[in-house]
Amino acid sequence: MRSTLLFVAILALSLAWSLGAACEESQEQLMPGGGHSKKDSNLYQLPSSLLRRLCDSRSISLDGLLKMLSKASVGAKESSLPQKRDMHDFFVGLMGKRNIQPGTPVDGNQENAPSLGTFKYPPSVE
């Protein structure tokens, strides 16, 4: 869950940094003598009105980021239970046995199960 939040935060920061660079480039292109070619301007194929709106509304994007992070944390909690169950079933299949939880009936007859005998610890160990 923390790694997901960290990834989203890094992604948001890098996106904000790249949008800030795009806003600076678009403002430099508006000024004469910017020295940028058309190839540089094609790197960001967003309309200039959208770039201006994104650059001017930093608080809205932060609110959206916080909402997205809260949704991601809620989604991570919900999806972690099935993933744990799947991993448990995978390892149970590898081991060939299943943990018996208290309060659940046991399939099969335990009287017919082979036993290894009773092992008693020497008195010095206890």
From Swiss-Prot:
Pfam families: Neurokinin_B. Residues 21-83, 99-126 form a propeptide. It comes from the Eukaryota. Coiled coil: none annotated. Keywords: Amidation, Cleavage on pair of basic residues, Neuropeptide, Secreted, Signal. Its main location: secreted. GO terms for cellular component: extracellular region. Residues 1-20 form the signal peptide. The modification Methionine amide is found at M95. It is found in: Secreted. Tachykinins are active peptides which excite neurons, evoke behavioral responses, are potent vasodilators and secretagogues, and contract (directly or indirectly) many smooth muscles. Is a critical central regulator of gonadal function. Belongs to the tachykinin family. This is Neurokinin-B. The gene is TAC3.
